[in-house]
Amino acid sequence: MIHHVTLETRREDVDDAVAFWALLGFERVEPPSERLASIAVWVQRAGTQVHLLFHDAPVAPARGHTAVVAEEYDDAVARLERAGFECRPSTQDWGSPRCSVVSPGGHRVEVMAFPPNA
C-alpha cells in the first residue's frame, strides 16, 4: 500500500487543489506537526494521503501521474466535469473505465473505476 504522494503546488493554488481532491473523495487533514503544516497541506481518503507541498515554481512531470480508484467512477467524472475539469478517456487496457484530468497546479491524475487484477 502506498501511504502518500507529494505534489508541488503554489500556496495560492492550495484551496483549488484541495477542492479538486475533494471531488475524488479526499478530505483535508492536519499534518502531525506545525513544521509540516507550514510547508504543506494534506488530504486523505481511506488511509492514502496526498501532500500538497508549497513551492513557488512547482514541477508537474509531463508524463508522470498519480492514479486513484474512484469507486463511484461515473459520479466522480461527473463531479469533475461539473467543476470545469476536462476528463480525457483512456484505453480500457484491463476493462476498467479510466480518464486523465489535470489538477490545479498542472499535475495529471488518472481516475479509474477499478485497478488491474481487481
Predicted region positions:
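Structural preference for long, well-ordered alpha-helical segments within the folded cores
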Residues: 19-23, 79, 105
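Vicinal oxygen chelate
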Residues: 31, 83-118
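Short acidic/glycine-enriched loop/turn segments that link adjacent beta-strands
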Residues: 35-39, 60, 93-97
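N-terminal beta-strand motif that seeds the catalytic metal site of vicinal oxygen chelate
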Residues: 1-18, 64-66, 117-118
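Mid-chain, well-packed structural core segment of small domains
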Residues: 63-85
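Core segments of cupin and vicinal oxygen chelate
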Residues: 8-49
